Amino acid sequence: MYDPLRAKVKVALYSAIAFLVGLAITSGLGWTSKSYAMPVIAETAQISPEAVQPALDLSQAFTNLADAVTPAVVRIEARRPVTATNQEIPDAFRRFFDSPEGQNQPPSQGQVAGGSGFVVSEDGYILTNNHVVEGADEVKVYFPDRRYFDAEIIGTDPFTDVALIKVNAGEPLPALSFGNSDNVKVGEWILAIGNPGFGNSASLDFTVTAGIISARGRPLQLLQNELRSDPRFGDQASRWAIEDFLQTDAVINPGNSGGPMVSLSGHAVGINSAIASTTGAYQGYGFAIPINLARRVMEDLVEYGYVKRPRI
């Protein structure tokens, strides 16, 4: 006798068996539902040592160069009398000083400006920018090893923005050798080293940045414009001011003035001097005085205390 309930149970039972058999077969074939699949962990791509060796070599060159050069770089503090504060510091260079613009120290202290420099002889001669030390009645020099000394201003040259100072350390100092800035090529790697401190902070001292030579022989009219407005020089500004800057994209900021621009061979090829900026901070354009020009100025300052120029 036909029993509808029993028939329904049989159909359900056969359907369940068929489903389980089908599931077992598909699982064995690897057709598992995606919702239950284990995530596949990708293996890290293997890069051959040969492929990255040039980059590693360049990185190691930067490291070796920074280690070798930094001991010869110094931080400079130049104290100016209050009477000289607004007259001796050109507006175009004021952004390079640690002291905020328009903010002076008490009259008894004068104004302290910060900059950089680098030792060029074991007996303590140091190159820097004229605008870092001009008009100062007291100059202190700080080394990376925490030593510091009073410095004597040997001479300054506003027409090239080069200055020479000297310290007496009582022992030979680490010094940078001169490169040949005439041989520097556009696209060549360089390092810029200095002290981009802000607000008299030493927390950023001896910062190393890298970049390339972006251009050569840049005449910015920076020195001419500043000197032309100075009653000490008048029309001599356009006659004697020399602007032949090396341009770089290495980061240069306030306090870097006077620090070295160094080639990968470890030679100084320039003196960091200025930036082109609408904000007073780095925007991709830094400029350095070619070391060949600075060296000629230095030699005259050592011998005469000033730069001898031909006169007609």
What are these regions (language model features)?
Residues 4-16:
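N-terminal Sec-pathway targeting helices
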Residues 13-27:
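Hydrophobic membrane-insertion alpha-helices, especially the h-region
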Residues 2, 10, 26-312:
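Serine-dependent protease modules
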